């Protein structure tokens, strides 16, 4: 459920109403298997950047599946055997992952790790479709209802062989923690980009919203279909276009459906979530993609302070009730349509 998305950030130099010049200062490091970029505008010290990247590295050590010493790896190794005590951070992310699993009735399922490992999309052994028997075997290990979380911060997977994958939510949580750290250091404006999980802090110096370009799912990186104008928001996009392989002319992408065991097959090409917390945007972008347009729209309309932009394979763009106030479509090859129009067309 990991997602790598390219979101083009508009504006390098920011000017205040008084014509004072604010130059962007960016630092980047390769962490969590992706490029993490922090951009600040007030001449912050190098120590603040270092502290922010230290936060990312510390969190990754807790929840990464690629690090055998992580707390998450210890939980997975103890599945069917015993509960494992974890830190407050890991506890919060696992608890949030189960919340979204319940909310989506399993469309988002943190116990999907066995399937993710089997498909290996984005790994060195990608390129082959697993046998149906293998998929069914792994599916038997996926059930968020068998993930037990106790109030004393102990986590237990009831069946041996079960595993948790927080790839669809942890990066959002870490982005939120980085934002909290930067604000505690006096940062008033900036942009956090953790491999496509975008958080903007505050506004531009003159009080205007930041302008964030949203990737066109059918074009090369850095080509965007429109811009989101936001203040103190987070933006996360999931799509079929970043990690995939072809077999016999069919594309297999990395967003897996826990119910079928295969990559999601619906009419969506990408979905962008705009919300206040990146942990929510991260989980919702995957959840709504799995649910599809109709069920996804129903879910996003039931959630406060979160909006969605749906992009279909037919180049239609649909908005949740408040998204069109934040997002402007610039590419004229796309069509803005309502949910009613979409359902009428799609049913024909």
Segments predicted by a language model, with ranges:
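Repetitive helical segments and hydrophobic/amphipathic motifs
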Residues: 11-12
């Amino acid at each position: 459920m990991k997602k790598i998305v390219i979101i083009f950030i508009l504006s390098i130099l920011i000017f205040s109403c008084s014509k004072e010049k604010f130059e962007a200062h960016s630092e980047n490091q390769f962490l969590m298997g992706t490029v993490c970029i922090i951009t600040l505008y007030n001449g912050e010290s190098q120590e603040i950047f270092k502290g922010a990247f230290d936060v990312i590295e510390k969190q990754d050590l807790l929840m990464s599946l690629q690090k055998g010493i992580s707390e998450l790896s210890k939980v997975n190794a103890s599945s069917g055997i015993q509960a494992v005590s974890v830190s407050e951070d890991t506890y919060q992310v696992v608890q949030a992952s189960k919340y979204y699993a319940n909310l989506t009735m399993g469309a988002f399922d943190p116990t999907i790790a066995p399937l993710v490992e089997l498909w290996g999309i984005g790994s060195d052994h990608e390129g082959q479709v697993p046998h149906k028997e293998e998929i069914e075997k792994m599916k038997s290990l996926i059930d968020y209802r068998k993930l037990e979380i106790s109030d004393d911060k102990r986590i237990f997977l009831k069946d041996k062989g079960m595993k948790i994958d927080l790839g669809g939510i942890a990066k959002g949580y870490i982005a939120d923690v980085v934002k909290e750290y930067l604000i505690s250091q006096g940062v008033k404006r900036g942009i956090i980009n953790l491999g496509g999980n975008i958080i903007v802090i505050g506004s531009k110096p003159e009080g205007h919203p930041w302008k964030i370009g949203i990737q066109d799912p059918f074009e090369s990186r850095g080509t965007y279909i429109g811009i989101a104008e936001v203040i103190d928001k987070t933006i996360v996009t999931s799509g079929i276009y970043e990690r995939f392989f072809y077999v016999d002319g069919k594309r297999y992408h990395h967003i897996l459906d826990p119910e079928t065991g295969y990559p999601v097959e619906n009419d969506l090409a990408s979905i962008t979530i705009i919300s206040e917390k990146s942990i929510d945007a991260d989980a919702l972008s995957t959840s709504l993609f799995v649910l599809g347009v109709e069920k996804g729209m129903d879910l996003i309309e039931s959630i406060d302070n979160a909006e969605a932009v749906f992009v279909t394979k037919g180049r239609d763009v649909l908005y949740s009730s408040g998204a069109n106030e934040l997002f402007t479509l610039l590419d004229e090859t796309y069509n803005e349509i309502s949910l009613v129009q979409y359902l009428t067309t799609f049913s024909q």
